[in-house]
Amino acid sequence: MPSNLEKAQLMSVLARSKGNWGDKYDRTEHFKRFQNLKEIIKELSKQGWLIVHNKPKFIGISLNTKFKKEIIEFIEKERPYLKGIIK
């Protein structure tokens, strides 16, 4: 089971460096460093925080803009040094 820190790390990468909100998604193959990637994606998509795009050749993920406030609060709670950086 992935920790909240692992979830926050994935979401912070999506939000901060890649800007993947809503229709802008990134391939899961770019996140190989996360050992529990499938479990993280499953849990976050079940919450509605992560949107999964199943394409014929790859799977893309992005953050759900409907939960932007909650996602940012979660990331800042788990990774306090990012407070005020993610918008």
Region locations from a protein language model:
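Surface-exposed polar/charged interaction patches
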Residues: S17, Q47, E78-Y81
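Short amphipathic alpha-helical interaction segments
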Residues: F31-Q47
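A short, conserved structural fragment
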Residues: S45-K55
